[in-house]
Amino acid sequence: MEVSGPEDDPFLSQLHQVQCPVCQQMMPAAHINSHLDRCLLLHPAGHAEPAAGSHRAGERAKGPSPPGAKRRRLSESSALKQPATPTAAESSEGEGEEGDDGGETESRESYDAPPTPSGARLIPDFPVARSSSPARKGMGKRPAAAAAAGSASPRSWDEAEAQEEEEAGVDGDGDADVDGEDDPGHWDADAADASFGVSAGRAHPRALAAEEIRQMLEGKPLADKMRPDTLQDYIGQSRAVGQETLLRSLLEANEIPSLILWGPPGCGKTTLAHIIANNSKKHSIRFVTLSATNAKTNDVRDVIKQAQNEKSFFKRKTILFIDEIHRFNKSQQDTFLPHVECGTITLIGATTENPSFQVNAALLSRCRVIVLEKLPVEAMVTILMRAINSLGIHVLDSSRPTDPLSHSSNCSSEPSVFIEDKAVDTLAYLSDGDARTGLNGLQLAVLARLSSRKVFCKKSGQTYSPSRVLITENDVKEGLQRSHILYDRAGEEHYNCISALHKAMRGSDQNASLYWLARMLEGGEDPLYVARRLVRFASEDIGLADPSALAQAVAAYQGCHFIGMPECEVLLAQCVVYFARAPKSIEVYSAYNNVKACLRSHQGPLPPVPLHLRNAPTRLMKDLGYGKGYKYNPMYSEPVDQDYLPEELRGVDFFKQRRC
């Protein structure tokens, strides 16, 4: 369970106020770290505007003081202005590296001093690390050295660094641009096109060594590292959270209703909740995450109790995100009802199952269902290219025959890991709209290729120097093993596929029938379930047009029961093709439905069985007239004129009319 820390509470954070030693502004102690990280980048050494006549003006005229003097000045000013409050360095202990400035209200326009990277060396107690690695920009993460040096937020870091580079005229590699053109830090595209056959339609990432890429890919899954933090970076769901949608307006206004996010795996449900969480913390809203796979009812009650206390004492809202909410049973879901109704919590649930079947109707009526669709191939390519660029991998045009591995240049500005553009397109297609599968498949393919090259060099006795590593389409396919088939035996897709199979056979489309059968079996469906449905189809849709169809279906069921998968799949395929080609008749099916409709619509008690049709096993029954007047048909050579329906239903033909 993840709960936002107490430093996000505006009531508690106002108890201790400290003054920034650079810009002299007062602020809560919990926000001094993130403020100093930006303030030091925006103000050069000693360039904060002091009051008129201050002795600091003379010091600034003489030039910046050494780092030691600046450190002493911070301690002295903090001690003089806030004797009962710990210094900013001490107050930063125990804080996370989230970089959230909470209720901070100062803006960058209030500073008139030009930015300079020398501000990072002013006060060692609050260091500001710099890194030119493109991975931090693309992935929103800092390298290990930068993470150990400070706790500035990735977004503040990138904006300050971009402003510095723009004003200083320095490119992404730290070299001045002498030609006056903007250099995004990529290696020479023209030279790459000429030497390596690089695709002109792809962005050129900054060159990174293979070992750097390996270190970046180790640890957390790539899908988690690439998770966006803002709606602007959220790709592929414009229909649900596009610019003109109601939900987008509510999220940007921080008016978040109770939501049920419904969509296939990897479409962005958890990511959207992550974006809402980041935005909520900026507005001092408590955000709690639970997973229905391991949470219990007591965990939910504890969260609700805390939410009630937060609302009563601090007027603070609580958003509760339940991942895989369909895993909760009906009684567990009922726990949310009164608290969602009265506004104690705002519930956000994520599910891959149809909420109409898996979520209580009462709870569903109190939430807005947001349908997230499977990501299109174009969106998948965009997501994969963002990850590839952030890793410093270069995309090659596979239509050009030049092999980058054949070049022996060891120039450090050239990329060391390449991937074919065809491999990117194949990965986007095989992921089947699942961004998690695509990104993790890319991670696995790159790591496997780097590892295999290292093992080859070790076995051959060569020095391991992976200056040229190429990821091909086959590497991507091997990483995924097979196409990502979306199928859930207990979910909506189960019923969707069997319905499609039934309708394809009814329409005599043998190709489509085989496709839907294979999709179910390859997705892990029980073959006996399919065989039972075929037995039903034999009588419902074929009926008397081909009476042998029923025998075919029963034989297929018995065969599946005897031999099982995968051998029985051809038995089912034979039966499905036979049914698709067979003539169709619903005469029996329709007539029986007419009989059921007649019985259900009959007014009053049902008519009795005529006496001549009743059995008379005893003398008393015979004396009462049971069986009297019945004509035994085999005793007559001609058809017998005899009524077999109750008197009220005489003349009714269920094969020709729908109702009696």
From Swiss-Prot:
Cited InterPro entries: AAA+_ATPase, AAA_assoc_2, AAA_ATPase_RarA/MGS1/WRNIP1, ATPase_AAA_core, DNA_pol3_clamp-load_cplx_C, MgsA_C, P-loop_NTPase, Rad18_UBZ4
UniProt PTM: Sumoylated with SUMO1 and SUMO2/3.
GO cellular component terms attached to this protein's record: chromosome, telomeric region; nucleus; perinuclear region of cytoplasm
GO molecular function: ATP binding; ATP hydrolysis activity; DNA binding; identical protein binding; zinc ion binding
Residues bearing PTM N6-acetyllysine: K628
Reactions that this protein is recorded to catalyse: ATP + H2O = ADP + phosphate + H(+)
Region (Disordered): 48-191
GO BP annotation list: DNA replication; DNA synthesis involved in DNA repair; innate immune response; regulation of DNA-templated DNA replication initiation
Modified residues (Phosphoserine): S65, S75, S91, S92, S153
Residue positions, PTM Phosphotyrosine: Y529, Y557
Keywords linked to the UniProt accession: Acetylation, ATP-binding, Cytoplasm, DNA damage, DNA repair, DNA replication, Hydrolase, Immunity, Innate immunity, Isopeptide bond, Metal-binding, Nucleotide-binding, Nucleus, Phosphoprotein, Ubl conjugation, Zinc, Zinc-finger
Glycyl lysine isopeptide (Lys-Gly) (interchain with G-Cter in SUMO2) crosslink site(s): K477
Compartments, as annotated in UniProt: Nucleus; Cytoplasm
Domain of life: Eukaryota
SUPFAM superfamilies hit by this protein: P-loop containing nucleoside triphosphate hydrolases, post-AAA+ oligomerization domain-like
Domain notes: The UBZ4-type zinc finger binds ubiquitin.
Family per similarity comment: Belongs to the AAA ATPase family. RarA/MGS1/WRNIP1 subfamily.
Protein name: ATPase WRNIP1
